């Protein structure tokens, strides 16, 4: 659907086979973990690789596999507004919040907070965590530095992206969100443009038709729907998938 939307100059789909061999060798132990194909450690690598190969001022929209693009009139208008927000500002990042109740300190380890010198009583720790499944990046010196800082986290302590510290946390902690925790804190440190959750509409389906990016990948579907999707994959790929 992304290709048919006319929203993009280019649409790229990537998989494990597209990762650089040096990256694979460096993080082989983490990548062997089934969760997120290695705690989603690959995500920053593919975005950074794409960012390096576009012109300054160009914009990348990263979406997790399974996301759907809505091309209804109001959604198209909103999509253009996303780009205008970036192009009309000096900011290189546009991000979306998760659901309001999901606070940073509930889904980020103390060790990661300490790395960034962020206290649990700060506004960042008590703010809503940002999504890592839908992110806009405009190429600039600032956005390239963002990914250098991401790599520095991993070089300092690879366990900051894993579940290694899950038993050393305060009572409010629920679980580490791995790549999302790092992307979220860096997004706030870099003063991203932050919008409320405009991608997940499972509990407010009546609103989804006005927004362009739908993170429907986590929806529950029965066997009948899965069989339909397998049989008519080429057709469904050209249709917006709603919640």
Predicted feature descriptions by range:
Residues 1-243:
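Glycosyltransferase catalytic domains, chiefly GT-A lineage
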């Amino acid at each position: 659907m992304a290709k048919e939307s006319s929203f993009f100059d280019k649409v790229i789909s990537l998989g494990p086979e597209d990762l650089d061999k040096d990256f694979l060798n460096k993080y082989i132990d983490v990548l062997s973990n089934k969760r997120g194909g290695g705690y989603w450690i690959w995500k920053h690598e593919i975005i950074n690789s794409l960012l390096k190969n576009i012109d300054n001022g160009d914009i990348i929209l990263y979406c997790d596999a399974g996301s759907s693009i809505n091309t209804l009139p109001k959604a198209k208008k909103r999509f253009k507004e996303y780009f205008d927000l970036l192009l009309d500002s000096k900011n290189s990042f546009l991000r979306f919040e998760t659901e309001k109740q999901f606070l940073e300190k509930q889904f980020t380890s103390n060790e990661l907070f300490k790395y960034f010198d962020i206290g649990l009583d700060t506004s960042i720790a008590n703010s809503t965590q940002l999504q890592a499944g839908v992110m806009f990046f405009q190429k600039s010196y600032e956005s390239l530095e963002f990914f250098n800082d991401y790599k520095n986290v991993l070089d300092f302590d690879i366990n900051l992206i894993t579940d290694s510290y899950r038993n050393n946390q305060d009572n409010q902690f629920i679980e580490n969100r791995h790549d999302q925790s790092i992307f979220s804190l860096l997004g706030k440190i870099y003063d991203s443009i932050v919008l409320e959750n405009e991608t997940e509409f499972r509990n407010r389906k009546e609103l989804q038709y006005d927004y362009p990016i739908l993170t429907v990948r986590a929806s529950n579907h029965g066997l009948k729907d899965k069989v339909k999707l397998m049989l008519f994959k080429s057709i469904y790929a050209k249709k917006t998938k709603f919640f």
